[in-house]
């Protein structure tokens, strides 16, 4: 049976703003308090989705989350009607309201970890929503993420949904941003590579000193158990703590994979040679080669990789069998990075084409092309069981652009977050969106 990789991109929400909430993410910190343009951000994301669909890729849409997150404000003691709750929060702490108004669910690489049916002992696709324990503004996402995923992947014969891991540092989980799957055809067995930043139950191991390691080995191992993965086709690799301290807050800022190919920096992993030997051996056991494209420090520094999000790219297999790397405009603007990319596509590797997209609104908040998408490998039967209303086509692209034009602002500052009109505008937009995407009542205000 034929297999597909379906990319589900997050639609940017109407409260997209620059709050500098993500310590360890240098772009997020640098652009704190800048004016944002939610309408442009959403349209930039939609353009990428449509362009990839037009290339023949399977492309889906994940809905934004309700923000401001009034239920959490109520848990924190703010009372009255919803507009009063938001106003009180603004008076008490603009920073708290900003945190609970973040449009961070757009970065769906952190939404969940997904294991395809070919790898799972029960032959079903498994989803575990990420607890995103390391950052308060993201730790509130798991419940809505789970409900959105369940509305898209409903059929229990094909799909299994697990609760997020416990909300403690020991099980800090950042989802697919620290997870790669290598293999051949998307419908056949692969090798899953879980990347972690620290191991809580073994304090003797090296770890970062400046920035937090957001993913733990304990979390990755728990997900592998939940997803019923075979140990002989699963690898756990530690990210190099030195690059975490240089701003590589997720593995997808320093490495990306597709099928047999791993595209990564020279300093991406701790004990890199040993890790790749294990991956190579496990790939051989499923009859596949492991192709390592390693970018040396003397061609692209870690600092340049972080600044341009070279590795926060997408590698996509086209219908003709070749691979295209999708990079942000910032990669083209950096001479060293652009020179390397153009040399790479002449090297005879499977990657033979480059596509550049302007995602500046997301990039300024610290998220590139790979941050915006959740990869789901499906066979034909499973793809036919997906909610068809979320799959990108000409009609959905036009409808969502009109929806954005109708509901989104083109300028948003932090002080606008307490505007009662913004709350009501957003809720009206989300009510309409759930009908467009056929999601049902997934938002707290709809219940």
UniProtKB/Swiss-Prot annotation:
Catalytic residue list: 174, 250, 371
Stored Pfam families: AstB (PF04996)
Catalytic reactions on record: N(2)-succinyl-L-arginine + 2 H2O + 2 H(+) = N(2)-succinyl-L-ornithine + 2 NH4(+) + CO2
The organism's place on the tree of life at top rank: Bacteria
Residues where substrate binds: 19-28, 110, 137-138, 214, 252, 365
Main EC class the enzyme belongs to: hydrolase
Keyword ATP-binding among UniProt keywords: no
BP term (GO), one: arginine catabolic process to succinate
The UniProt record lists the keyword Hydrolase: yes
UniProt function note: Catalyzes the hydrolysis of N(2)-succinylarginine into N(2)-succinylornithine, ammonia and CO(2).
PANTHER family in UniProt: N-SUCCINYLARGININE DIHYDROLASE (PTHR30420:SF2)
Subunit structure: Homodimer.
Name of the protein described by the UniProt record: N-succinylarginine dihydrolase
């Amino acid at each position: 049976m034929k297999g597909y990789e379906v990319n589900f991109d997050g639609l940017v929400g109407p409260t997209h703003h620059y709050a500098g909430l993500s310590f360890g993410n240098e772009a997020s910190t640098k652009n704190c308090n800048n004016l944002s343009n939610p309408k442009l951000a959403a349209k930039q994301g939609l353009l990428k989705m449509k362009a990839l669909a037009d290339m023949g890729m399977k492309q889906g849409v994940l809905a934004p989350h309700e923000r401001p997150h009034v239920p959490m404000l109520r848990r924190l003691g703010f009372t009255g009607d919803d507009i009063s709750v938001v106003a009180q929060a603004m008076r008490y702490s603009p920073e708290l309201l900003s945190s609970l108004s973040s449009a961070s669910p757009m970065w769906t690489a952190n939404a969940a970890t997904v294991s395809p049916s070919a790898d799972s002992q029960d032959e079903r696709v498994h989803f575990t929503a990420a607890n995103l324990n390391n950052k308060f503004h993201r730790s509130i996402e798991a419940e809505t993420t789970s409900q959105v995923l369940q509305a898209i992947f409903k059929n229990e014969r094909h799909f299994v949904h697990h609760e997020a891991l416990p909300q403690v540092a020991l099980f800090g989980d950042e989802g697919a941003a620290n997870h790669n799957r290598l293999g051949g055809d998307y419908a056949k067995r692969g090798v899953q590579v879980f990347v972690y930043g620290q191991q809580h139950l073994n304090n003797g191991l090296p770890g970062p000193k400046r920035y937090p390691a957001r993913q733990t080995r304990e979390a990755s191992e728990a997900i592998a158990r939940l997803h019923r993965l075979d140990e002989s086709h699963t690898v756990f690799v530690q990210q190099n703590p030195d690059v975490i301290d240089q701003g590589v807050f997720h593995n997808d800022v320093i490495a990306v994979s597709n099928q047999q190919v791993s595209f990564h920096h020279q300093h991406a992993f701790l004990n890199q040679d040993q890790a790749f030997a294990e991956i190579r051996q496990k790939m051989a056991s499923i009859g596949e080669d492991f192709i390592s494209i390693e970018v040396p420090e003397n061609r692209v520094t870690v600092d340049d990789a972080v600044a341009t999000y070279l590795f926060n790219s997408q590698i996509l297999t086209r219908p003709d069998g070749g691979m295209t790397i999708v990079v942000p405009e910032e990669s083209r603007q950096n001479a060293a990075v652009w020179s390397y990319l153009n040399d790479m596509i002449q090297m005879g590797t499977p990657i033979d084409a480059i596509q550049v997209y302007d995602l500046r609104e997301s990039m300024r908040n610290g998220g590139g092309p790979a941050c915006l998408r959740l990869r789901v490998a499906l066979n034909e039967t499973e793809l036919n069981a997906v909610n068809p209303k979320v799959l990108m086509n000409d009609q959905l692209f036009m409808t969502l652009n009109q929806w954005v034009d109708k509901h989104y602002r083109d300028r948003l500052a932090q002080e606008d977050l307490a505007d009662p009109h913004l709350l009501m505008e957003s809720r009206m937009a989300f009510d309409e969106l759930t009908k467009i995407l056929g999601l049902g009542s997934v938002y707290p205000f709809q219940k």
